[in-house]
């Protein structure tokens, strides 16, 4: 209040104090975030000017939100260490943590996710969503991030039309 702005920090599905029985990796969460944004706008009205920011899965969610139609009160997006899509992130973790290839587990898990939650791992794509975003976006990523590999931010940055900025933080991990 002292600085003249408000901060809304909602928990995504099945995280923090939020309800839900499964983390949705940002894909269904993007719709929840848009509802929160609209609620904030209803509360603050004409004075609303919004920056949408997220870290890690929240960053992927932020980018997934960015590809949806945006009301005039949204001014820009800030993503910090978000992944390209769920398929890429899960494939990387399957290999890194368990030494397993994509086939057959990724294909089975993708199919089960489609059946249970109505979306697939490749559909849940920050990469496709940022390509549709025409508002400014600031990308932040550590050059030592091995959880969400730094290479992912370069793909995301390349896919996003101008205006955009990229900051690779030297020595920073996830």
List each language-model region with its residue ranges.
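Conserved alpha/beta-hydrolase
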Residues: 2-19
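Alpha/beta-hydrolase active-site loop
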Residues: 23-44
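Alpha/beta-hydrolase fold nucleophile elbow
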Residues: 44-56
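Glycine-rich nucleophile elbow surrounding the catalytic serine of serine-hydrolase chemistry
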Residues: 54-64
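Hydrolase active-site cap/lid region
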Residues: 64-120, 128
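Short beta-strand/loop motif that positions the catalytic acidic residue
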Residues: 132-134, 139-141, 145
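Conserved alpha/beta-hydrolase "acid-adjacent" motif
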Residues: 146-152
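Catalytic histidine neighborhood in serine/cysteine hydrolases
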Residues: 157-174
């Amino acid at each position: 209040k002292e600085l003249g702005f408000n901060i809304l920090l909602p928990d995504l599905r099945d995280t923090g104090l939020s309800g839900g029985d499964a983390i949705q990796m940002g894909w269904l969460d993007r719709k929840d975030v848009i509802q929160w944004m609209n609620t904030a706008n209803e509360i603050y009205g004409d004075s609303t000017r919004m920056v949408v920011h997220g870290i890690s899965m929240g960053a992927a969610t932020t980018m997934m939100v960015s590809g949806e139609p945006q009301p005039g009160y949204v001014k820009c997006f800030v993503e910090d260490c978000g992944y390209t899509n769920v398929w890429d992130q899960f494939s990387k973790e399957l290999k890194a943590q368990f030494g397993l290839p994509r086939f057959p587990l990724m294909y089975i898990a993708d199919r089960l996710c489609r059946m249970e939650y109505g979306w697939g791992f490749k559909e849940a794509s920050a990469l496709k969503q940022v390509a549709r975003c025409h508002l400014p976006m600031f990308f932040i990523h550590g050059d030592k991030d091995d959880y969400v590999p730094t290479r992912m931010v370069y793909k995301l940055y390349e896919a996003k039309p101008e205006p955009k900025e990229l900051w690779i933080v030297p020595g920073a991990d996830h």
